[in-house]
């Protein structure tokens, strides 16, 4: 088991993290190439202030919430925060980043990190419940939506259990290996699934350049097509 742990911490972590970085870079290159090819010099005439303002408004997307999906959308928004902050700022993770990058990055206190981890787990469970039991969300959900939520839940739950022996049902080595492997599976999946939007948020939200839409037009078009059941 120790050999597997060392492999998961070392070569496998490096390989899967590299796959994620290269995959995300590929998506950025494709989007930038598409923009420059299709728009060319017209990019200089694009309404950049409106586009950037619209993208920034999604950082706290209160005005984008559509009636009937407010609770689901709010939980989804909060989940995204936890899904970014915990992997980047948890003290054990920061120690790993510092070892790899040779930096001295700040980290969350362990107590705060525990609460944020539990909060993120609760958000994932809530999203699963909504997709399962709310008819309008169930009809919009595909099998991949459920699978991805479960896969996202695994590294958070296993990491918390590994750090807290009193709630850990498995030997520490087994739980830590589960944590590492589930996280590394997500590394590989991120560039090839909708999980990429968590990382490429800004690039997703400036797609108005492609269509030369007025600010808020995307929301209005989606609501006109799909009504209140549109995904937010």
Stretches with model-predicted labels:
Residues 1-232:
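Membrane-embedded alpha-helical bundles that constitute the cytochrome b-like, heme-associated redox core
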């Amino acid at each position: 088991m120790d050999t597997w742990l060392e492999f998961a911490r070392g070569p496998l972590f490096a390989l899967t993290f590299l796959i994620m970085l290269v995959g995300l870079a590929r998506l950025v290159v494709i989007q930038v190439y598409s923009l420059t090819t299709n728009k060319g010099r017209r990019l200089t005439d694009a309404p950049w202030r409106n586009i950037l303002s619209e993208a920034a408004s999604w950082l706290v997307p209160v005005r984008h919430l559509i009636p009937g999906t407010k609770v689901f959308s709010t939980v989804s928004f909060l989940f995204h925060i936890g899904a970014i902050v915990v992997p980047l700022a948890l003290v054990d993770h920061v120690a790993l980043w510092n070892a790899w990058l040779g930096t001295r990055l700040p980290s969350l206190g362990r107590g705060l990190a525990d609460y944020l981890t539990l909060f993120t787990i609760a958000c994932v469970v809530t999203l699963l419940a909504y997709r399962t039991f709310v008819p309008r969300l169930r009809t919009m959900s595909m099998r991949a939506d459920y699978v991805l939520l479960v896969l996202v839940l695994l590294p958070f739950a296993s990491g918390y259990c590994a750090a807290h022996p009193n709630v850990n049902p498995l030997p520490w080595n087994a739980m830590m290996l589960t944590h590492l492997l589930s996280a590394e599976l997500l590394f590989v999946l991120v560039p090839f699934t909708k999980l990429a939007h968590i990382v490429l948020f800004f690039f997703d939200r400036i797609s108005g350049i492609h269509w030369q839409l007025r600010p808020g037009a995307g929301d209005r078009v989606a609501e006109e097509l799909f009504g209140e059941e549109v995904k937010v």
